Amino acid sequence: MSKFVFVTGGVVSSIGKGIVAASLGRLLKSRGYSVSILKLDPYLNVDPGTMSPFQHGEVFVTEDGAETDLDLGHYERFTDTAMTRLNSVTTGSIYQAVINKERRGSYNGGTVQVIPHITREIRERIHRVAANSNADIVITEIGGTVGDIESLPFLEAIREFKNDVNKNDVAYIHVTLLPYIKTSGEIKTKPTQHSVKELRSIGIQPDLLVCRSDKEINEGLKRKLSGFCGVNLNCVIEALDADSIYSVPLSLKNEGLCKQTLNCLELEDKECDLENWEKIIHNLRNPGNPIKVALVGKYIELGDAYLSVVEALRHACIEQKALLDLYWISAEMIEEKSAEEYLNDVDAIVVPGGFGNRGVNGKIEAIKFAREKNIPFLGLCLGMQCAVIEWARNIAQLPDASSSELNPDSENPVIHLLPEQEDIVDLGGTMRLGVYPCRLQKNTTGKELYNEDVIYERHRHRYEFNNYYKQSFLDSGYKISGTSPDGRLVELIELVDHPYFLACQYHPEFLSRPGKPHPLFKGLIKASQEKLEQSN
């Protein structure tokens, strides 16, 4: 029988609930408990798949093909546990399910209301995660901030949830902010008191307070919060601003978050094994020489749009004992000026995924620069498609070569729509999504990096390499190092006479973990280090 932990946030948005939930998951797993983490998002979109990266950040893709909130990436990276579509719930998906049931007559003509129908559907989703994962502990993060009207059905649902299970099977954690007023030199607790008061008015009494602060919280403040908020003194947890998100589990462990959560759930506080995690933090805090990596994207104004790519680069640098020096380069800026102006001093170039025409020519110019100047390069999804277009235009002498997405009238569509996508009208949840196998070819860099015959990678795309141009591509110095098992789809390409030039149609960043960097990212950083050593 699973136990349940609910994580809410107060005072301000972006308080770090996702990192707290992921860190608790890491701490519980280090004690031998199995964990699954669920995100409840209070927006009306069915999923974030069609949302702008500028508004929502990256869309994280699960093994079973769900387009989810980026917090699921944190959950997977911290716990090294794969999540599924069940782990991502939005208000839109809840209402859609309830309305579909009403249309089918499932409510026997009854009046459908937020209470009990919407809240019951939410509770059923949480129970479904527990049943599907068979986890010892299910952690549920409630998106938004206590007091938001959008979050009310979720908060009511988790209030009701304690009636579904035994009292000691549920714990409520409230993440809040203690602002420091510089002029008075004081940390203020009043916003937290009001946030907890709001929770109590709904019927939820938090068991633990996780207090975000950039100043240390003294014993007196903890006692004050304990008294005003009705929380045991040992359950007032300090969460100071950290130098890295990966150091948060260790600081929360020292504050007793996991121990007190287990105490609330009446579970054994087993011996904790964080030795590998401590090694990761040691390498992170004691890096070697910097590696200057240019991330050439079209959504760089919001760093979260490429969150998993950045974390994958960080994991590789931690493993290789290098300092990640990340250059955020707008592809449109390269179009306006030149690749040389922005990329001349970098050690590696990454061109990530994206959609649409904007900035594509800048990406292509960056790839050309990497190819001609022998700069280690990694292309992801659209990055691979741009690498193929760059080859066609500059090596194969097909100046009008393009993708049928970018130029439907091109006479040389070296990238074209997957056949199964041709009759699809809806945008949401209809791409090639989730894990697919890829067979690696012998005597390729890809095979050497993975050291596997068949790999499994996550996808999110509609367009693929046009096999009509395959032989011409191979004859010009490129290798196709990975394909679908039937050989129909090109998944991984590489340039032969180059220090490191690989591009893949899939998204390897979703499978990178701290302590277990993805082979393609590790290979990129290693190649950059080797090239630097040779130049010195």
From Swiss-Prot:
TM stretches of this protein: none
Region ranges (Amidoligase domain): 1-267
Protein name listed in UniProt: CTP synthase
Catalytic residues identified in the record: C381 (nucleophile), H507, E509
A GO molecular function held by the record: CTP synthase activity
Binding positions (Mg(2+)): D71, E141
NCBIfam families on file: PRK05380.1, PyrG
Matching CDD domains: CTPS_N, GATase1_CTP_Synthase
Organism encoding this protein: Prochlorococcus marinus subsp. pastoris (strain CCMP1986 / NIES-2087 / MED4)
Residues in Glutamine amidotransferase type-1 domain copies: 292-534
Amino acids binding L-glutamine: G354, L382, G383, M384, Q385, E405, R462
UniProt cross-references to Pfam families, sorted A to Z: CTP_synth_N (PF06418), GATase (PF00117)
Protein family: Belongs to the CTP synthase family.
Statement: the UniProt record of this protein carries the keyword Iron-sulfur: no
Keywords carried by this UniProt record: ATP-binding, Glutamine amidotransferase, Ligase, Magnesium, Metal-binding, Nucleotide-binding, Pyrimidine biosynthesis
